[in-house]
A protein has these predicted regions:
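A generic "binding-loop/recognition-motif" signal
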Residues: 10, 21, 56, 180
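Conserved beta-strand termini and adjacent loop/short-helix elements that scaffold enzyme active sites
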Residues: 54, 77-79, 128-130, 175-177
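Conserved N-terminal catalytic core of the sugar/cofactor nucleotidyltransferase
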Residues: 2-5, 27, 31-113
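Structural signal for interior beta-strand "rungs" in well-ordered beta-sheet cores
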Residues: 209-260
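Hydrophobic packing residues within well-ordered alpha-helices of enzyme cores
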Residues: 14, 60-64, 193
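N-terminal nucleotide-binding beta1-loop-alpha1 segment
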Residues: 1-19, 171
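Short glycine/serine/threonine-enriched helix-capping/active-site loop
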Residues: 1, 126-128
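Catalytic-core segments of class I nucleotidyltransferases/pyrophosphorylases
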Residues: 99, 106, 112-119, 130-204
C-alpha cells in the first residue's frame, strides 16, 4: 500500500505564520511538520509515498532535497486549486487503495494498526477519530470504490463530507485513536503541539551550565543549531529558539518562538 501526503495547503487560519511558507513547512521544535509525517510513515514500513503539493511547492521540493534522508521513495504531484477529495483521487493514480495523511496532523497512533483494522473490515474506508462526536481526523485509508459510490462533485472535503457520508451508509469504519493527536489549523493549536513535544516527546535540548555562560535558561526549551545566547539573557521554560537566532541580553517569555 502506498501513502498519500496532502501538503499543498496554505494554512489560511495560521496566518501570519504561513505568509512565506506552506503550512506543511512550519517548524515544530526545529523540524518541519512534513518531516514528522514522513518519519511516521517510515516507522510504519511504507516504501512509497505521493506528495500532493500546491502552495509553496518549490519550497517543499527544496526541503526534501536538503533535509530528507529517509528510505521512502517520494513522488511529487501538483494539486494546486484542488479540493482534498480531488487531490486524493489524483494522487491515487492507479492504486486501488491508499493511506492518506493530511499534513497538518501530528499523531502518535501506530499506522500499522489502522491498516490491520482496515484489512479486517469489508468497507471502502477506515479513518482515525479523536473526537467525542466521531469526527474523522486527517488520517484515513480509502479504496477507489469510495469515490465511485459518492458524488465527487457534491462532496469536496474528505473529513467533512466524504468520510461522514460513508460512515452513515456503512461504507466506512472509524477507529478510536490512541495517544496524542493535534490538528494544526490555528496558531493556538501550533503552540499547543509544540508545548506537548517539549514536555512529552523529549524534544527539549537539555542544557548544562557551560552551554551558555551567564544566561538563565529554564527547562524544557528547544535551542537549535548555531544559536547565540549572550550573558544576562533570560529564556523561560517552553520557549523555542530556532537555528541561527541571537539573544542579546533580553528576556524570552515562556512559549515564545524565535528564529527560522
Amino acid at each position: 500500500m502506498k501513502a498519500v501526503v496532502l501538503c499543498g495547503g496554505r494554512g489560511e487560519r495560521l496566518m501570519p505564520m504561513t505568509d512565506r511558507r506552506p503550512a506543511a513547512l512550519l517548524r515544530l521544535c526545529g523540524k518541519e511538520i512534513l518531516l514528522f509525517t514522513l518519519e511516521m510513515l517510515g516507522k510504519a514500513g511504507f516504501e512509497e509515498a505521493v506528495l500532493a503539493v500546491g502552495y509553496g511547492s518549490e519550497q517543499v521540493e527544496r526541503l526534501l532535497d536538503e533535509k530528507y534522508s529517509g528510505k521512502i521513495k517520494l513522488h511529487i504531484i501538483n494539486t494546486a486549486g484542488k479540493s482534498t477529495v480531488q487531490a486524493v483521487r489524483t494522487a491515487m493514480c492507479d492504486e486501488t487503495e491508499i493511506l492518506a495523511v493530511e499534513c497538518n496532523c501530528i499523531c502518535t497512533h501506530p499506522l500499522d494498526e489502522i491498516i490491520k483494522v482496515h484489512l479486517s473490515h469489508d468497507t471502502f474506508c477506515t479513518a482515525l477519530t479523536y473526537d467525542t462526536e466521531n469526527k474523522p481526523a486527517g488520517i484515513y485509508i480509502v479504496k477507489r470504490e469510495l469515490f465511485e459510490s459518492l458524488n465527487p462533485e457534491k462532496h469536496t472535503d474528505m473529513t467533512e463530507d466524504i468520510i461522514p457520508e460513508a460512515v452513515k451508509s456503512g461504507e466506512a469504519v472509524l477507529l478510536d485513536g490512541k495517544g496524542y493527536y493535534k490538528r494544526i489549523t490555528t496558531p493556538e493549536a501550533f503552540l499547543d503541539c509544540q508545548r506537548h513535544m517539549l514536555y512529552n516527546e523529549n524534544m527539549s535540548q537539555r542544557l548544562t551550565e557551560n552551554n551558555f555562560s551567564g544566561a538563565a535558561i529554564g527547562e524544557p526549551v528547544y535551542i537549535g543549531e548555531n544559536v547565540s545566547v549572550m550573558s544576562g539573557s533570560i529564556i523561560e521554560s517552553g520557549s523555542v529558539i530556532d537555528n541561527n537566532a541571537v539573544v542579546k541580553g533580553g528576556k524570552v517569555n515562556g512559549y515564545v518562538g524565535i528564529g527560522s
